[in-house]
């Protein structure tokens, strides 16, 4: 079976390094799947779940808050702003953050604070979707 090397790195740590058979992430134009032999490219990532499948069929779900995906002939590199394994996300804290962001939207008239609340809300929703994808595959 053909494989690619993959590295997933955030500003804080390297989350994944090893061989993969497939990677699926959310780019700015929608979901992108990367298999061995994929055309080289660089794209921006949107907040959301990224799935990494190993050659033995195991799948790891990682939340990325955004970043860059680079595909080379034998290597995939993800440079994420923030990245966490899905099983490390705390659903209750994320639900609370979403409620707080929604409340901020109701109470804000300042454009800057409204944009910050919208960004926080989008991040919370993306994290919750990541948790659901992780739970559905388990």
Swiss-Prot record:
GO cellular-component term (any): plasma membrane
Entry-linked Gene3D superfamilies: ATP synthase delta/epsilon subunit, C-terminal domain, F0F1 ATP synthase delta/epsilon subunit, N-terminal
MF-aspect GO terms: ATP binding; proton-transporting ATP synthase activity, rotational mechanism
Top-level taxon: Bacteria
Primary location recorded for the protein, binned into one broad class: membrane
Family matches, as Pfam families: ATP-synt_DE_N (PF02823)
This protein's UniProt keywords: ATP synthesis, Cell inner membrane, Cell membrane, CF(1), Hydrogen ion transport, Ion transport, Membrane, Transport
Membrane disposition: Peripheral membrane protein
Family, similarity comment: Belongs to the ATPase epsilon chain family.
Assembly: F-type ATPases have 2 components, CF(1) - the catalytic core - and CF(0) - the membrane proton channel. CF(1) has five subunits: alpha(3), beta(3), gamma(1), delta(1), epsilon(1). CF(0) has three main subunits: a, b and c.
Name used for this protein in its record: ATP synthase epsilon chain
Species per Swiss-Prot/TrEMBL record: Psychrobacter cryohalolentis (strain ATCC BAA-1226 / DSM 17306 / VKM B-2378 / K5)
Gene this chain is encoded by: atpC
